[in-house]
Regions:
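Intrinsically disordered, low-structural-confidence terminal and linker regions
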Residues: 1-5, 9
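Nucleotide-sugar donor-binding/catalytic module of glycosyltransferases
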Residues: 18-169
Length: 169
């Protein structure tokens, strides 16, 4: 970091160095997290969203093509869906993995849902072969039964009010 700093100073001089430093410090990306937090709902607002009933409550199908997904990432994706303030969703996973890592996590979660009597649904298909993200996504689309479709990567997470906001529009 020191050598990079010295390089910038040599290349741009003191005035240019100060300008570059100011640009870095005031970059929108540095304040992104703070700005996003201003718009996230409070726990009280999330509770109100969970209690809210829409005239029409469509099922939202979330399509996820999976391939050798890190178990922790997959569990975080599941937790982000389970924590939604709108709960009429289904997860449609098309798994092109060579190993059974994704399948084990998903089948265990399905069993937990069944034992708890949860409304959540997971539709899972183990593909015969991995055909890449596009074809695996197309296979995931075949599992969809919801009125709306969303797409996520296998390592994505959603804010807790994301699906509520989709239906609220």
């Amino acid at each position: 970091i020191v050598s990079k700093t010295v390089g910038v100073y040599k290349r741009y001089g003191l005035k240019g160095f100060c300008t570059k430093l100011n640009e870095k410090i005031s970059s929108p990306m540095r304040t992104y997290g703070k700005r996003v937090a201003e718009f996230l709902p409070t726990e009280e607002e999330l509770g109100a969203q969970r209690e809210h009933r829409f005239l029409v409550e469509p099922c939202i199908s979330i399509v996820v093509p999976a391939y050798e997904t890190n178990e922790q990432f997959l569990k975080e994706l599941l937790a982000s869906l389970e924590g939604q303030s709108y709960d009429n969703w289904e997860l449609c996973i098309a798994d092109g993995s060579r190993t059974d890592q994704v399948e084990r996590v998903i089948k265990e979660r399905i069993r937990q849902y069944e034992d708890a009597g949860c409304r959540y649904k997971i539709r899972y298909e183990r593909l015969k072969e991995n055909n890449g993200i596009s074809e695996n996504t197309n296979e995931g689309l075949k599992l969809v039964t919801g009125s709306y479709v969303g797409f996520m990567d296998h390592d994505d997470v959603l804010e807790r009010n994301a699906l509520f906001e989709v239906v609220n529009v």
